[in-house]
Amino acid sequence: TLIGPKGLERVVNALRVIAPELPFPIIFKEITQNEQDFEVKGYHIHAFRVQHNVTCYGYTIQIPRAGRFHAEKAKELGIPLTFWSHLQKGETMTDGDKVYTPDMVMGEKRKEIKVTYVTDTRPLPIIAEQAKDADLFICEGMYGEPDKLAKAKEYKHMTFSEAASLAKEAQP
């Protein structure tokens, strides 16, 4: 699944001229709003518009995490080892008249993993808002030298120090 601005499918299909055969299908999801949410294979993806010379978005991806598997509890209950991975995936298993459910051996859900990714933009408040408490924040910084600030503003990019300031703001 590819998520991106309007015209994404046209651009990718033009590139497929050089790689027409792919071993997987491509599903396109075009962003039509300044902020938009998507659910893809259990992941929650929030796209948000950033400031660049062409339409560009940042993304926050939230990955849910199941609770920890309690192997000792599974052993105590006599659950066959071959069922363990199924129970960890949330599946109910039966063995004759015995029924084993995930809640018998799984702990509470753990904190989700949060990743925020932005590229090609000037600093914006929404970036720090989206990156707040992220486990990983990937942020562009096109110019390392402070004297390149005017160039960064002209071409709608960030300096390293601007990117670092956003990261600091996101992790109070």
Language-model segments: which ranges?
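A short helix-to-beta-strand connector/capping loop
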Residues: 21-27, 40-41, 112-113
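Non-catalytic surface loops within mature trypsin-like serine protease
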Residues: 6, 32-33, 63-65
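Short acidic-hydrophobic surface loop/beta-edge motif
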Residues: 35-40, 93
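Short loop/edge segments at beta-strand edges and connector loops
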Residues: 30-32, 119
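Binuclear metal-ion centers of metallo-dependent hydrolases, dominated by the metallo-beta-lactamase
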Residues: 33-35, 123-172
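Short secondary-structure boundary/capping segments
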Residues: 18, 35-37, 106-107, 128
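Active-site-proximal loop/helix segment associated with metal-binding centers of metalloenzymes
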Residues: 43-117, 121-130, 136-141
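Active-site HxH/HxHxD metal-binding segment of metal-dependent hydrolases
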Residues: 1-30
